[in-house]
Regions:
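C-type cytochrome heme c attachment motif
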Residues: 29-38, 48-49, 60-63, 88-92
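C-terminal capping alpha-helices of c-type cytochrome domains
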Residues: 61, 70, 79-104
Length: 104
């Protein structure tokens, strides 16, 4: 019985994460893609790549911008209206992107 309950819990978590990723992608297309690129690879020289970053790291940074603890004129405006749920969704989207590196 415990195994069935645990499997159900894991499936629900996976489904919730998939929903967060999809919602995060939609939000990122509107709020983030201009600077950070449609796939998290920055299009502007001063914007960092977000693809493949840790969800925890991204969430902490967005919350720091939102609270004013971390200062940036653009990011402060972008992050200010974000809810905790939207931050979780954006973080899930960018952390779900797989990045590969080619050595020279």
């Amino acid at each position: 019985m415990k195994k069935v309950w645990l499997m159900g819990l894991m499936l629900a978590a996976a489904s919730s994460f998939a929903d967060d990723v999809a919602s995060g992608r939609a939000k990122a297309d509107v709020a983030c893609a201009l600077c950070h690129g449609p796939n998290g690879i920055a299009t502007l020289p001063n914007a960092p790549n977000l693809a493949g970053q840790s969800a925890l790291y991204l969430s902490e940074q967005l919350k720091a911008y939102r609270s004013g603890q971390r200062q940036n004129a653009v990011m402060g405006v972008i992050a200010k209206p974000l809810t905790d749920g939207e931050i979780a969704q954006l973080s899930a989207w960018y952390s779900a992107i797989r990045v590969t590196v080619e050595l020279p």
